[in-house]
Every structure is written in C-alpha cells, then in structure tokens.
Amino acid sequence: MKKIKIISMILILCMLCSACEGTSEEVAPIHTENTEINKLSPYLSITRSFYSEESESGMGSRCFFYDIKEKKLEQKGTVSYTSSHPLTLYSTRNDKIYYSAFSGEGKGNQIYLDNNETGEKKTDQFCDFNYLIQCGEQYFMAAELLHHYCIEPIVCDAEFQNCSRVMFDKKDDRFTWMVSTVPKENKIVFSHYSDNEMREADDVEGGNAPSKIAMLDLGTKKTETVYETKYYIDGIACEGKKLILSCAPNGVTTRQKHKIYEVNLDTKKSVRLKLPFYIMDQMALYDNILYFLGWKGDTRGIYAYNLTTKEYDVIMEEVEDEFINGFSLNY
C-alpha cells in the first residue's frame, strides 16, 4: 500500500481514485540567486480537521498559527478538506493560507491559496503532498508528481512558479518520509527509504529496510546524507549537531515499539531519551525545545518540551469531533 499519511473519508478516497491519471510536465528548475533567511520569527502552522456540512466532502480544515516566542495560538481560518489528507500552511509573508485540494479527475491534488475564501490554484503538476513548509522566501514540500509513484523533496519559489526536484530518483523507488526544518541554517532535514525494501520488511517482523537521513541546504539546493539507521523513522528533528529521532524496528507490529534517540551528528553516537510522552509523528527542534505531536497519558496534542529544563507546555489538545493532522516549523 502506498505510504502516504491519510486521515480521509470514504467519499474523498472515491473522488481521488483517478486523481493521478492526468498528463504531467516535468517540474521546472528553480531560479533563485539568493535565499536570505526570512527575518520573521519561526512559528508553527497547525492543521486540524473537522466535520463540516458546508463542504462537499463533509469535512473542513482549520489552520492555526502558533508564535513560539509569545506562546500564543491563533486560528487563521478554515478551508475545505477535499484532498487525500488535509494539509494547510499559514504564511507570515502575505498573511494567507495555502492548502492542498482535489483539482479534478485526473488532475491530482494541488496547492491553492485561500484568497478571501476563494481558492486560487497555484500548482498543476502534482498528485499529492505530505508536507508544505515556508522557508524564508521559498517553500519546501514532500510531494508526488503526476505520473510518478514516490514522494520527493521539492523546493518552490515564493509564487510556486518555479519548482525543482532536488533529489531525483530515476527508479521512482525512494520515499521522502519524515521532514523538519533547521531554521538557523536555512536547511531541511528529512528521512527517506526504498519502497521495495520497506515492502519486503513488512513481510518479516524486524526485517531490514534502512532509512537514511539527509540534509538539504536551501541556498545551494544540495543534499547530504548525515546519518543512516536500520530502523523505521516516524519522527525527526534537528538543530546544530543534535538529531532527534523517533524510530523502531521495521515490521507492521514492531513499528509500535518505537523509542526516542538523540544522535550526535559529529560522532554518530546515539543515546536513548526517556521522555514522559508518547511521540510517533511530526517533530521540530528550535532553541533546544522539542515540538511534537504525541500523547501525554491519554491526551493527544501538540507539545513543547524543553530538553534543558525538562518542563513542557501544551500548545494544543485534541478536541471532540476534531483531529490534529499535523504541524510544521516555518520561518
């Protein structure tokens, strides 16, 4: 089964059965002479889905902005949820919401700009998305192109007019899986694996399907492998030489036995972190504070855990009849 993270209604899945059958063009290379880091403070953009009678799909998505310095949470708006899984991004550059939406039979899911509650289509070459993140004057996405299979790392300019495939795989076998930003270095850290190896590992509990951790420099568009592990990665964050991983042995049931590790990227040595949380999803690291989607006891939500003081803040708790789909650290 294709490993795209979805929280989706049967109606939406039916709509998307033919979403990726259209014609596509190669993604054009991006032309950016410099990529100065946006001076705005890093922030979280959060997506939370809910049932909506106003939407054709019966669901909608809320987009939230969280100021990590002021520790203030604000809902920025709502959009229809028609894509395979809800994905929103609040941009501090134009005070607008970007979101993924179903574009029509054979046309896949595309990125739209919510412009006075109307959707302005910004892309036409994609099929699906796992991530959309603001990185200074650019956007990073983990996306699937029309007529392709795997999720790739893609960098787009501020208007989505020029995009580049920064880690092209001729075999179309490499999945870009977990993603996080490294704002102070203007970089993206992400894990990737071979889909064929992962399928084989699913057949044998604890089977070997190595994951590689790569660092993408958004200024040069160059990638570098910084770490490798035999484990399945279900969470990643990085700052400086500190890499935080949520991982587990491969296999359908053994993946539930995940643990959190801190890796020194200079020495490649790892130590297990025993945190009072259950983390098995998106993470981010900034000023030695670990932001993550997980559980504290029976309460699922987004938390901020200070790795130095061991204190934590609750950013958002899940509420009845709504589901926190994910977040991203943007700048």
Residue positions per predicted region:
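Residue position within the beta-strands of beta-propeller blades
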Residues: L44-R48, Y99-S100, F140-A143, V189-H192, ...
